[in-house]
Swiss-Prot record:
Gene Ontology MF terms: ubiquitin-like ligase-substrate adaptor activity
Notes on the domains: The Elongin BC complex binding domain is also known as BC-box with the consensus [APST]-L-x(3)-C-x(3)-[AILV].
A biological process from GO: proteasome-mediated ubiquitin-dependent protein catabolic process
Assigned protein family: Belongs to the VHL family.
Places the protein is found: Cytoplasm; Cell membrane; Endoplasmic reticulum; Nucleus
Name assigned to this protein: von Hippel-Lindau disease tumor suppressor
Bilayer topology: Peripheral membrane protein
GO cellular component, as recorded: endoplasmic reticulum; nucleus; plasma membrane; VCB complex
Amino acid sequence: MPRKAGSVEEAEAGAEEVGAEEVGPEESGGEESGAEESGPEESDPEEPGAAAEMEAGQPRPVLRSVNSCEPSQVIFCNRSPRVVLPVWLNFDGEPQPYPTLPPGTGRRIHSYRGHLWLFRDAGTYDGLLVNQTELFVPSLNVDGQPIFANITLPVYTLKERCLQVVRSLVKPENYRRLDIVRSLYEDLEDHPNVRKDLERLAQEHIENQRMEGETEDFN
């Protein structure tokens, strides 16, 4: 049975890391680890829907967590002014939300090597960076030291930042009452979306692999 990223356990306050909490093991068997019951962040790749898709011959998503048995201790550090929503990509590439992180806080995560994480503004779903990139993949711990995932704001373009501010001030039903060019109505209505970002990242991953293959052939 594959390991899962679902069972969440909060440790007592006062962890050594600044404001760090602890999130319990990503185990498939809660009865083995004392984990809580499955929450919305869990997804079992052996569920009927997933099995039916595999039987239908549909390809699995490019971006998904690897079913690894190699644990990795990670500390999520929110170094942004936003409330952060950690999102785990399960073994079928489905985004699974985790408890939010207030600004300036941290949380210890019992993750696994090869699992994929990304981070979003919990209120607006604006994209955030983790260690200066969009995806975080835990590696193995060295000498028992945890891996730090530093979550920060990217440098948004002026247009992106303006759209964020307008969305925070104007209700969606009132966008088209604003005295702006029509194309900006559509931009405002095109709210940040994790699934769209995953499609873009998957295409970038495929393109990078293709370019690497062409480079190897050339050499």
